[in-house]
A protein has these predicted regions:
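Transmembrane and membrane-interface helices of multi-pass
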Residues: 1-211
Length: 211
């Protein structure tokens, strides 16, 4: 019906705005790609700070622990992975270009997967509740075990995710093939400022436009 078309059109527009905002993580990753941060002594200082942060998140009582759920584990895994990858890039300069290429490919794959997964989730969420994402979807992060159990029982998870990963891999291959020059010839500081200006403008407009 016309109402359904309007709802999904509005939903797609809303998703585009949200993804523009969430692309901030991708933007941060891309603008911080450089070789200068691995020079002495900067590289060792940064690595030491990352190790300290990882130990604090792992053994300390952080704000993530107050929220509970899967957030502490997610934070620990993210910082631990960041520390490991920075260490590899720092201590293995001969393999830095190769590691950076595969890391870039993985980040693009992860981003594409999240976008596609969100589309699939919205489809099933609509069929289940008759509405778009709301606070119930946010609660999924807190009640992870219960939600995962319900999903595994209710939907053909393995075929869905198999197809999702195949499509995401194909899209990632196309994107990386067209954009790998970004990591082969790292943009200058001035170029990064220009790119950042454009993104921050889109970020601000999207943030103000999100319903």
């Amino acid at each position: 019906s016309l109402d359904t078309i309007k709802i999904f059109t509005f939903g797609i527009l809303s998703d585009c705005l949200v993804f523009t905002v969430l692309s901030g993580f991708l933007w941060l990753y891309l603008i911080f790609i450089s070789n200068s941060k691995y020079l002495k002594p900067t590289g060792y200082i940064v690595f030491g700070l990352l190790v300290s942060l990882f130990l604090y998140v792992t053994f300390g009582n952080t704000i993530l622990n107050e929220y509970g759920g899967a957030l502490p584990e997610i934070g620990m895994a993210f910082i631990g992975l960041k520390t490991l990858l920075f260490g590899l890039l720092l201590f293995l300069p001969k393999y830095r270009s190769t590691i950076r290429f595969w890391l870039f490919s993985f980040v693009i794959f992860l981003f594409v997967t999240l976008i596609l997964q969100n589309g699939i989730s919205e489809f099933f969420f609509w069929n289940e509740f008759g509405v778009k994402y709301n606070f119930i979807a946010v609660d999924y992060l807190v009640y992870t075990n219960e939600v995962l159990g319900n999903i595994m029982q209710s939907y053909p998870v393995i075929p869905l995710f198999s197809g999702l990963f195949i499509v995401a891999a194909m899209v990632t291959y196309f994107i990386v093939k067209r954009s790998k020059h970004f990591i082969e010839m790292i943009p200058t500081f001035t170029e990064k400022i220009k790119i950042s200006g454009i993104y921050l403008l889109l970020f601000g407009l999207s943030l103000l436009s999100i319903p």
